[in-house]
């Protein structure tokens, strides 16, 4: 049972089913790349789509989505397979058409009663995702866990957990677009899938030619096991973005994007809230925390732009080389902040034949990772939704720092 302030509701899940490709597919083994099978990607990535009531109310989203998956898996057949480990824990996918997990569910509440503004649904987001038992969701498990939850009003939520070693958000978008196109009578997807994982593998003679701070082994990754982490969300609309721009010089030398402004703001507020040793290193790129905390926003902005400039094809190859040479080192988590901007993928325009979603994106953050999604606030204003996750003591300080920057607090806490 879940609660929303004084509202109680139940989500009844049916027994899980396996959806397979509707036509025979190649039975083969495909090797993942050195980037794919790194330790830092061995997790399930949650994605959620919230849809209003279907016009006319006669279409069943469960049947529509289940049928579309069976069609799309004919072309994206590796998604219906299973990951296994080869020698040296190398990940491979057995394309055996065992299928993706699919759960039909019903919530005994109207969608509009569950939320005070669309973003307040997040405390209950796990109710709309498949429960993943025992296997941990990576080795020998379905590569997609999908749940469709219908509401009494006719609205529904599509919740997906994606094995991140198999694909990223862009790969999932292509798969879902294929699902939509095939449901609308297309004979093939407009963007046929291409494997080519060798493009993300180490070179025949791997080499390390630069410092990779994101895998820095000299930095302690220890976290206090007693830390009580809190999840929350922030909405950056035009008012918040303008508040950040107002802190820039009158005639800035550089042009800063919305992504730059949001990332610099969150990075600085987060670093101050975590109260690190002023001489420690804080990373979106590399910087001494004391300097970041006391410097103006433009200092963080310039470092964000430097970090973006480093993300070249050559750098990806260098990362693959390092992963092979050093045996898949884990991401450094101490004062490391990873951000992913998926606003350009326009998940909020994704139509399965049931209309466009009210919200679509990655709904939850980890202690080190946040994703930026397009969204609307409860006033219908367009903006960017950002989930965050911090220790409870740091969250209060983070909110205070955020108010100083944009005169706005957190939207919701989980």
Question: Which residues are covered by each model-predicted region?
Answer:
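Soluble acyl-CoA-dependent acyltransferase catalytic core bearing the H(X)4D motif
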Residues: 2-29, 41-78, 82-347
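A common structural junction motif
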Residues: 179-187, 404-413
């Amino acid at each position: 049972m879940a609660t929303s302030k004084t509202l109680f509701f139940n989500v009844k899940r049916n027994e899980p089913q396996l959806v397979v490709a509707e036509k025979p597919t190649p039975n083969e083994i495909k090797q993942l790349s050195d980037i794919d099978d790194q330790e830092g990607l061995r997790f399930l990535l949650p994605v959620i789509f919230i849809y209003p009531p279907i016009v006319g109310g006669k279409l069943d989203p469960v049947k529509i989505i289940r049928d579309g998956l069976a069609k799309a898996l004919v072309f994206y057949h590796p998604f219906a397979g299973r990951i296994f480990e080869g020698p040296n824990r190398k990940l491979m996918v057995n394309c055996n058409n065992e299928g993706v997990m699919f759960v039909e569910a019903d919530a005994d509440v109207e969608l509009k009663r569950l939320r005070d503004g669309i973003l307040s649904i997040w405390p209950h987001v796990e109710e709309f995702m498949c429960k993943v038992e025992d296997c941990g969701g990576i080795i020998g498990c379905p590569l997609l866990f999908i749940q469709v939850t219908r509401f009494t009003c006719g609205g529904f939520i599509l919740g997906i957990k994606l094995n991140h070693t198999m694909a990223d958000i862009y790969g999932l978008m292509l798969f879902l677009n294929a699902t939509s196109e095939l449901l609308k009578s297309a004979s093939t997807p407009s963007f046929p899938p291409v494997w080519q994982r060798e493009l993300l593998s180490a070179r025949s003679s791997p080499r390390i030619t630069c410092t990779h701070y994101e895998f820095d082994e000299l930095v302690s990754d220890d976290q206090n096991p007693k830390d009580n982490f809190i999840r929350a969300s922030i909405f950056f609309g035009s008012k918040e973005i303008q508040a950040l721009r107002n802190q820039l010089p009158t005639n800035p030398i550089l042009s800063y994007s919305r992504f730059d402004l949001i990332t610099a703001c969150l990075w600085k507020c987060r670093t101050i809230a975590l109260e690190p040793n002023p001489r420690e290193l804080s990373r979106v790129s590399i910087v001494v925390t004391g300097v970041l905390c006391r410097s103006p926003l433009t200092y963080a902005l310039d470092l964000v732009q430097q970090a973006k400039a480093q993300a070249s094809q050559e750098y990806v190859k260098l990362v693959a080389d390092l992963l092979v040479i050093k045996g898949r080192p884990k991401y450094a988590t101490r004062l490391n902040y990873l951000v992913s901007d998926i606003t350009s993928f326009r998940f909020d325009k994704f139509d399965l034949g049931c209309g466009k979603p009210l919200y679509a994106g990655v709904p939850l953050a980890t202690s080190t990772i946040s994703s930026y999604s397009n969204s609307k606030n409860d006033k219908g204003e367009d903006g960017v939704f950002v989930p965050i996750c911090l220790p409870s003591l740091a969250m209060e300080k983070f909110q205070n720092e955020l108010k100083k920057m944009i005169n706005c607090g957190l939207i919701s806490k989980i």
